[in-house]
UniProtKB/Swiss-Prot annotation:
Tissues with expression: Predominantly expressed in the liver and to a lesser extent in kidney, small intestine, and colon.
Job of this protein: ATP-dependent transporter of the ATP-binding cassette (ABC) family that actively extrudes physiological compounds, and xenobiotics from cells. Mediates ATP-dependent transport of glutathione conjugates such as leukotriene-c4 (LTC4) and N-ethylmaleimide S-glutathione (NEM-GS) (in vitro). Also transports an anionic cyclopentapeptide endothelin antagonist, BQ-123. May contribute to regulate the transport of organic compounds in testes across the blood-testis-barrier. Mediates the release of nucleoside triphosphates, predominantly ATP, into the circulation, where it is rapidly converted into AMP and the mineralization inhibitor inorganic pyrophosphate (PPi) by the ecto-enzyme ectonucleotide pyrophosphatase phosphodiesterase 1 (ENPP1), therefore playing a role in PPi homeostasis.
Record note on modification: Glycosylated.
Membrane-topology descriptor: Multi-pass membrane protein
Binding site for ATP 1: G661, P662, V663, G664, A665, G666, K667, S668
Keyword Aminoacyl-tRNA synthetase: no
Protein name: ATP-binding cassette sub-family C member 6
Keywords: ATP-binding, Cell membrane, Glycoprotein, Membrane, Nucleotide-binding, Phosphoprotein, Repeat, Translocase, Transmembrane, Transmembrane helix, Transport
Chain intervals for the UniProt region annotation (Disordered): 854-909
Stated family: Belongs to the ABC transporter superfamily. ABCC family. Conjugate transporter (TC 3.A.1.208) subfamily.
Amino acid sequence: MNGEHSMATPGESCAGLRVWNQTEQEPVAYHLLNLCFLRAAGSWVPPMYLWVLGPIYLLYIHRHGCCYLRMSRLFKIKMVLGFALILLYTFNAAVPLWRIHRGMPQAPELLIHPTVWLTTMSFATFLIHMERKKGVRASGLLFGYWLLCCLVPAIDTVQQASAGSFRQEPLHHLATYLCLSLVVAELVLSCLVDQPPFFSEDSKPLNPCPEAEASFPSKAMFWWASGLLWKGYRKLLGPKDLWSLERENSSEELVSQLEREWRRNFSELPGHKGHSGMGTPETEAFLQPERSQRGPLLRAIWRVFRSTFLLGTLSLVISDAFRFAVPKLLSLFLEFMGDLESSAWTGWLLAVLMFLSACLQTLFEQQYMYRVKVLQMRLRTAITGLVYRKVLVLSSGSRKSSAAGDVVNLVSVDVQRLVESILHLNGLWLLFLWIIVCFVYLWQLLGPSALTAVAVFLSLLPLNFFITKKRSFHQEEQMRQKASRARLTSSMLRTVRTIKSHGWECAFLERLLHIRGQELGALKTSAFLFSVSLVSFQVSTFLVALVVFAVHTLVAEDNAMDAEKAFVTLTVLSILNKAQAFLPFSVHCLVQARVSFDRLAAFLCLEEVDPNGMVLSPSRCSSKDRISIHNGTFAWSQESPPCLHGINLTVPQGCLLAVVGPVGAGKSSLLSALLGELLKVEGSVSIEGSVAYVPQEAWVQNTSVVENVCFRQELDLPWLQEVLEACALGSDVASFPAGVHTPVGEQGMNLSGGQKQRLSLARAVYRRAAVYLMDDPLAALDAHVSQEVFKQVIGPSGLLQGTTRILVTHTLHVLPQADQILVLANGTIAEMGSYQDLLHRNGALVGLLDGARQPAGEGEGEAHAAATSDDLGGFSGGGTPTRRPERPRPSDAAPVKGSTSEAQMEPSLDDVEVTGLTAGEDSVQYGRVKSATYLSYLRAVGTPLCTYTLFLFLCQQVASFCQGYWLSLWADDPVVDGKQMHSALRGSIFGLLGCLQAIGLFASMAAVFLGGARASCLLFRSLLWDVARSPIGFFERTPVGNLLNRFSKETDIVDVDIPDKMRTLLTYAFGLLEVGLAVSMATPLAIVAILPLMLLYAGFQSLYVATCCQLRRLESASYSSVCSHLAETFQGSQVVRAFQAQGPFTAQHDALMDENQRISFPRLVADRWLAANLELLGNGLVFVAATCAVLSKAHLSAGLAGFSVSAALQVTQTLQWVVRSWTDLENSMVAVERVQDYVHTPKEAPWRLPSSAAQPLWPCGGQIEFRDFGLRHRPELPMAVQGVSLKIHAGEKVGIVGRTGAGKSSLTWGLLRLQEATEGGIWIDGVPITDMGLHTLRSRITIIPQDPVLFPGSLRMNLDLLQENTDEGIWAALETVQLKAFVTSLPGQLQYECSGQGDDLSVGQKQLLCLARALLRKTQILILDEATASVDPGTEIQMQAALERWFAQCTVLLIAHRLRSVMNCARVLVMDEGQVAESGSPAQLLAQKGLFYRLAQESGLA
């Protein structure tokens, strides 16, 4: 470093500087280890380093710099030391000039070196100044520079001190010592961090990430994360303990960049349609895209993230350079060990160089991993955000082709697989580069014999690519089966009440397990091929070694197998082995990623809502018409036929327009067209002013009442109170434990159906919009509540008076109150006008009213104004009827935190008091995974298979050890006349051991994968059984999202991750045993270093596992919130768009994703912290093994020395991967904990009992007797039904009525044993229902619920789930419900596939299909639980006529809101507060003028 020094030590010549002018052939070691060469390299490398990287660094900080730093004491000291070094080198350059001036000749380098270092030190000092100006607090560039600068002064200091020539040249010594002191001081100061900038552009977060405050060594080693790891080791981590998210990692920043590039790329595609970009017909289901659409998305991802990826790739390339330096250094080291005359310092230097090379390889590799992991995190955030934004703009046709479960599966599985593939992208080219470099090394070692290695390797490549191709086919098959299973599971969990009511659990379990069996079959085949692929690469490595050694010893002239050839070849082959083992895994991951990427790209290309489908303009006071449609023709999608034709409609300001028509006429489609949800084929649609929308099926969010009503609007308490009172929610909210702040639960699980509908209406009213579009908001309400809500809100004197209202309704009694009535039929406007005008026309409206007329008992001359006593006389009583607060219910229709489709309102539990229960949070376990979890998994694998697997791993590892040791013996064989005597024998046994190892490796890996598949099958069956056997209360308390997480994400981990982590752990653990034995046998002294290193490893592992397991669990729970919000938005996207609330919803998604990022980032940093520190500790073992070999050189053979050091070079990676594999396995084992969460939950009664089989014809008559019956829905709630004693005769038709909360539905639940009796009991035909199995009981009773439920699958499957009827019987049932013509028109007829839950059918059509399903069951007892509440009166007449014909001899229980429905019953039960208040015929009850009479008055029947 010092320019004064000569190129050799004082008194020692450099042989005329032969380093620079060498003509004689010398050994390689001479060139690389000559002190003159090392000193020359040390003199020129630091300046070259700084002058090459410095300008690039200056440009970077100029573009990315922030506020300047204050002139701190640290900066001042750095500058003073810099100027001191400048003065020193000025002096060193001046001395030779002075001597030349005095006539003393000087070597040119004595002047050149100080001059170069003078300019370099000046540049370094300038960089210190510029870093302060640009706000750089810790410099990695200068840290590396000062570190390099220490090399030559340190060597010179040692040599000069040992030479003892201070008196001869004191000035030279002092300059060298001063130079070293100053450089070391600069190095120490560069490890410190400067003060923060004077003025910060961003406000400082509460808990900033310590990376910004860390020094360069701390950043390189990830020591800045140690505080969080120590905190996680000492206590449970909470949100406050996690670091705040940096802006560059936030969702808002990342998604906006990717979306911008995605839109730009998509708009450049030929055939792009212009609006929004997306026009793929929805019939191309995104799960199975027919053509690749990945191009635009791939280009967008590359443009956004390429800089991070390329920088990481550069780090990886540098790391690999040091990786391949190790075999070269090992070759030099073994050359040193074989040369008895070489000096000892050469061995020490080589040991240090091997250690430094291994350390630099570790540091650069971990920097690559860190950057790629951060890139993965950012990419996951960006793509998830892109999917969420796509959900907000999906067209109605696209939504029908992709259920919420598919979308959530897309985010939770496909996005994850895509981001994981980023790590393997470089494997496609870099691993091939590894292989080439390895073959070059082999050529240098073994000469032309290495060519045989190329031949062997290339001959095996086609086999491996064939295996990979076959495996990708089975992988795609598994993905298809998995998606099918996810859809069916989601549907089952959403409709579990219907399934249990009918006793269909076994049929669905059989269907689901059949799909699961096909999925596991594909998984087993894929795992088998994966094992073959790995073993084939292992065999190819062994064959390379065998053929190369055989050819070399038998053919080559210099055929002796010495230590250098043997063990350097082994080291090179170990690198080759890693490349060949990692290559199929990389290909496998990329194949998976390609499938997932295609699914993502196809989803992002689905058809969007046309922004030009409806023109929304600000309100103008002068305008008379608020809504206008001119010659409008609309379709659901590009490929479907138009559903509305020739619509011409004008709605003036302040008008109440009622839209009526038969089922399937297009009423809801008209509102969708006005909202811009339908594809506009021709015409125009315009709306003036803001819009509020009330959907037919209520959609509420998992928030409080007030947040649902305000819906991102500012809180106005007086207006909120007025809205709640008008919507008949005031008394309900007052009864809630937290008032308006009471959480409603997921999908309103704490509310009844009527409450949810009124809450949905209140949300629209609170909006104070100019235009209101309401899709049958009164259908789910009791008659008196319906009247009240209409009068207070919708009607002429309601809160919405003066606004423009379009009301789609089946409630015909409101029609006289409407300003205009529009009648739709077959997608066209049949007629439009005022109520009186349409009556006089005697057209379509009159036909509707006639269809709703009572079948009998009304004279021909009755005026149409009183066409239906219930429907049209609703306002005759005058005044607002009094009503009690409707009691909320727990619902099984909670939205799925992983998957749900259209919200379904199951039969209302109208008598459960609210208890303030919120949606259940997903369980999060803390601490280490319990040993019982491992034991349960191993029991699922099976003890014999576990023992057999361990034995196989031991056998193959013994074969591996013997193979390496046999090679060391071969290398030590004496050489006679240039040949070894036993080469053939050595080669034959070497080949035999390699074959045994390959066989054992395949058998052991196949055993692990087969055991994993067996365990996965049993655990899934157990989870499915535990959930299916749970009572209905379990589903009311457990959000479906939590269940879907177990059935999707956690099951995927058990299927794939755990077997793979188990295989990795066993491979490395047994490999560690082999390495430990090898090192201990060759150099026993190394054991002294191994033991403390093992203690340090244990300490690092304890810190890491305690924190990482917590972070993993927190991350899983937080990601559930992201999935839940995504599913919730998918269900309510039409409402969100109608309210123009896309912005707030996007912001909420970004906030949830950012919270998940706050957990993901510390977890990936903890991974790097572990890897970097453990590998550095392992690199220390390399140094110990090498130094032990140097110390034992006198009595250690070259073969044993090579065996020791080459084994030590492997232990670093092996030890690190043992810890990582164990930790990954423990993290994955959390999934086993979670799938076993429901093992100990209460289960319902047995499905089948032996006593049931003895009565196959039960019940014969259908007599039902309640004896002092009572039940409560949960232990903490009051009795919902109590003291009910009555007998219903066989064949009797009994109506059950009562106000909301009276206990009507609870009676039927008790009859079906959905809720077990708390007191008393129920007898059917004299047999207690508790003596019958649940399936026996439920299969003998038919229930038609209020809301129709269909399942994914064919129409025939939906009608005859148990396949008990012929096609003729099914067609007869369809003809009875007047659906035969409709089904005949469907493609495939009975084999027509219902999408989702029959989303492509109208509510009325679905209800008629459910009726046909009931007709086919042919049971003696029929329950209609509000079955006609959601259909128009005409459909209701059809249903009643069919029921009267098919169930004339059956016992019928009819629960009804519409009293008209029970007027033909032989007896009516009036429920009040859980008891039977009145019982008798309708005429008797009306004559008593009791509760039934009051209800009839409210309905206009009395």
